[in-house]
């Protein structure tokens, strides 16, 4: 079997091993693949693995040997799954591999914002503590999480794990979820979307990107939030209208935002969030702990093994 990995660098920049994949067939690994290189590199392949390289209906039509597309991520909108189904091509994804890591990033942003860890460390290194008259100093508001309300937009694996961490901090947890009150643990209360935005101290986004959720965080909803509120996004960049968020931050409509994803990645130089007040941005690394990437690669190998055995797993285009 000919296997082509089109953009393997993000998952494995060199600190992990592809050996488990190589034993499954003739495996060629590219760090990155430009759109115009897809057909040449994938020619003759029965199996393609992609992270962010788009595979569309035209590609599939030009690759008659293609029978399997493995997405090296949970989200699979880079593949035209309907076209793949029409052609009998199996498409799989990697579910739940980074749940703990993403929840950890949610609270990395929350704790950095509420305790201003980065800011105060930088000020210490500038000499401000050394030259201070008191045994301590702070020059920004510091917030305790206990009894604060956190609103989770979505309560899948990552949302639920985030909820458990929040409960550990003594927070009041509310969630937008299709589950009934009776299906939720007593520590998690159900709430509708507008109510979450108007009542919660922290909003964390954990829902998929769909036509309905695109730019769900807009000027109207940001206007509902408390001026002391914090917005966290480790989900999908386009869930937020970035200009509206920048305006809300710059005008003091909300206190701060912590985002790990943007609408375009890498961001354009004129992305308004890059210069927005109290906007903390990490470069889409919530998923990228070594433990999560090891898990991703192991599941990717297992998915292809299952396909070869005639019992494919984690299919997204049944």
Please annotate each region the language model reported.
Residues 158:
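Hydrophobic/small residue at the entry helix of a nucleotide-binding pocket
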Residues 45, 63-66, 199-200:
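An anion/phosphate-binding loop that grips the pyrophosphate of nucleotide cofactors and donors
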Residues 1-45, 172-174:
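N-terminal glycine-/charge-rich "phosphate-binding" loop or analogous flexible N-terminal tail
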Residues 55-60, 172, 179-272:
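Rossmann-like adenosine-cofactor binding region
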Residues 296, 302-318:
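NAD(P)-dependent dehydrogenase/reductase Rossmann-like domain
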Residues 87, 95-149, 316:
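Phosphate-binding beta-alpha-beta segment of Rossmann-like dinucleotide-binding domains, i.e.
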Residues 31, 72-73, 89-100, 177:
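Short beta->alpha connector loops at strand-helix junctions that form conserved
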């Amino acid at each position: 079997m000919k296997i082509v990995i089109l953009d393997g660098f993000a998952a494995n920049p060199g600190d992990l091993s592809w050996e488990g994949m190589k034993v499954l067939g003739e495996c060629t690994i590219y760090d990155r693949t430009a759109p115009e290189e897809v057909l040449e590199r994938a020619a003759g392949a029965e199996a393609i693995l992609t992270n962010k390289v788009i595979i569309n209906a035209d590609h599939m039509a030009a690759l008659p040997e293609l029978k399997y597309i493995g997405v090296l991520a949970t989200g699979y909108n880079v593949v035209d799954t309907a076209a793949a189904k029409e052609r009998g091509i199996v498409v799989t994804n990697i579910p739940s591999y980074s749940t703990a890591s993403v929840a950890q990033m949610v609270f990395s942003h929350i704790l950095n914002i509420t305790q201003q860890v980065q800011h105060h460390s930088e000020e210490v290194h500038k000499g401000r503590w050394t030259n201070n008259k008191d045994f301590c100093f702070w020059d920004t508001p510091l917030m305790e999480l206990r009894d604060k309300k956190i609103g989770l937009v979505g309560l899948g694996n990552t949302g639920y794990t985030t909820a458990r961490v929040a409960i550990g901090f003594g927070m009041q947890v509310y969630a937008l979820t299709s589950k009934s009150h009776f299906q939720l643990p007593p520590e998690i209360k159900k709430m509708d979307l507008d109510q979450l935005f108007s009542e919660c101290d922290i909003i964390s986004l954990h829902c998929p990107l769909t036509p309905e959720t695109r730019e769900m965080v807009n000027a109207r909803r940001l206007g509902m939030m408390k001026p002391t509120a914090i917005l966290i996004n480790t989900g999908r960049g386009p869930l937020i209208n970035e200009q509206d968020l920048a305006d809300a931050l710059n005008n003091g409509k909300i206190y701060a935002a912590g985002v790990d994803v943007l609408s375009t990645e890498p961001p354009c130089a004129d992305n308004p969030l890059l210069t927005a007040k109290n906007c903390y941005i990490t470069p889409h690394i919530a998923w990228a702990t070594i433990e999560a990437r090891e898990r991703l690669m192991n599941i990717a190998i297992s998915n292809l093994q299952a396909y070869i055995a005639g019992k494919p797993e984690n299919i997204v285009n049944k």
